[in-house]
Amino acid sequence: MQVFADIAVLREQIKQIKREGRRVAFVPTMGNLHEGHLTLVRKARELADVVVVSIFVNPMQFDRAEDLKNYPRTLEEDLSKLNGEGVDLVLTPTPETMYPQGLDKQTFVEVPGLSYMLEGASRPGHFRGVATIVTKLFNIVQPDVACFGEKDFQQLAVIRQMVEDLCMDIEIVGVATVRELDGLAMSSRNNLLTLDERQRAPVLARTMRWISSAIRGGRDDYPSIIEDAVDQLRAADLEPDEIFIRDARTLLPISSESKQAVILMSAFLGKVRLIDNQVLDLQTDTKASSEEE
């Protein structure tokens, strides 16, 4: 496994790989790797001859300085895990390398609409930061395919739209969320939970499954379902942040045309913000009754 901090040196390596006609898969990460990240790496290995991973805590996508400061950084452990998975190339740039003129003078990429709805409405600039860094990394790595986790559902939608809009010749593959045995979605932020918070954290996933069961059972009173879910979270001392039930393709409100719904949830446990989502098929009769209202 080769590790690069220098973009130009990595580019030369990628050029040689391309000249040899080998297919490149890319997994961008912010480090503090867990089984969810490694699942992305394994999927990438299935799809290409060469696997490239980046480790970069992107300051442009953080809306709170405290979150950026506290984000876990475990580079040596991360490199050991990637080496164990047979990763070929790893890019570990610094903020100064990625943003040599500083964030204020950085050209940015922004996906209209998707970037400022749902989570984007409460985190202005977040998805701009995501789209910008992913575009920069795509330009550096020049992958044929890139793998992203479905846990960050809106982020995946933003990236797919960006790739389509900018005519990037890159296949975007979404990989299912990996969960702990108690159902909690794996996340680097889970390491910041206290023991007591960690024991309560699975309530988020349980509440999400309850919402799914309610919809599958025929309920289409979505505002009322969300109110009930908020009560369930607060009963376990989780502070609800956002709960949405939307069309899984457009992220717009459910309509008679919707074939699938996505439940998007976030809640705070102490200072840690947890997120989760679930996609489910919609029954024809449920959609019809919802539209009639």
From Swiss-Prot:
InterPro entries: Cyt_trans-like, Pantoate_ligase, Pantoate_ligase_C, Rossmann-like_a/b/a_fold. Keywords: ATP-binding, Cytoplasm, Ligase, Nucleotide-binding, Pantothenate biosynthesis. Signal peptide: none annotated. (R)-pantoate binds at residues 61, 155. Its EC number is 6.3.2.1. Its main location: cytoplasm. The keyword Lipid metabolism does not apply. It catalyses: (R)-pantoate + beta-alanine + ATP = (R)-pantothenate + AMP + diphosphate + H(+). Pathway: Cofactor biosynthesis; (R)-pantothenate biosynthesis; (R)-pantothenate from (R)-pantoate and beta-alanine: step 1/1. One of its GO terms (cellular component) is cytosol. The keyword Cytoplasm applies. ATP binds at residues 30-37, 149-152, 178, 186-189. GO terms for molecular function: ATP binding; pantoate-beta-alanine ligase activity. One of its GO terms (biological process) is pantothenate biosynthetic process. It is found in: Cytoplasm. The active site is at 37 (proton donor). Pfam families: Pantoate_ligase. Homodimer. This is Pantothenate synthetase. It comes from Vibrio cholerae serotype O1 (strain ATCC 39315 / El Tor Inaba N16961).
